[in-house]
């Protein structure tokens, strides 16, 4: 991770806090898309890795998976309900809209006044309040050109930066 990268401080913080250990061999892989399993694990670790009351019932989350406790915690705390049909889809790439929504729900879904000022965020989108909250709290400024990039893959650098900014 280059020291002049926008995500340097966030990755350093996340590594020091045990939120991420990277992808192996001393690498973080900042531009690699983040999966749903990785994102809930980052959130869970940032929350102190609390024990869930029960493991999740998702058919695609084995109790032995590294993200199993994180998924159970995320469900218990209303952060995610899965992707339908009894699945969580832990290996699916997470979009920026999904990532910010997970973060917003982890923060307790605080009330937001107004809407996000991004041309690609419809006021009735499920993630509209989450994006507005993230923008108003300095968590994201979008991808430029007045856009949030709702359907773009969320990279590992982006989610760790969002998480870092949300707690600072």
Regions found by a protein language model. Name each.
Residues 101:
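Catalytic DNA-binding helix-loop module of base-excision-repair DNA glycosylases/AP lyases
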């Amino acid at each position: 991770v280059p020291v002049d990268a926008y995500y340097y401080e966030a990755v350093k913080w996340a590594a020091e806090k045990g939120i991420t250990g990277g992808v192996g061999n001393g690498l973080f892989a900042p531009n690699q898309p983040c999966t749903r399993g990785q994102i809930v694990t980052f959130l869970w670790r940032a929350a102190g890795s609390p024990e869930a009351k029960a493991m999740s019932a998702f058919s695609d989350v084995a109790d032995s998976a590294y993200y199993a406790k994180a998924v159970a915690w995320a469900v218990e705390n209303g952060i995610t309900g899965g992707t339908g049909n009894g699945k969580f889809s832990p290996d699916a790439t997470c979009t920026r809209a999904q990532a910010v929504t997970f973060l917003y729900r982890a923060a307790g879904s605080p009330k937001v006044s107004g809407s996000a000022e991004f041309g690609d965020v419809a006021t009735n989108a499920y993630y509209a309040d989450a994006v507005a909250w993230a923008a108003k709290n300095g968590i994201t400024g979008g991808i430029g050109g007045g856009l949030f990039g709702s359907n773009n893959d969320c990279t590992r650098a982006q989610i760790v930066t969002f998480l870092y900014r949300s707690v600072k």
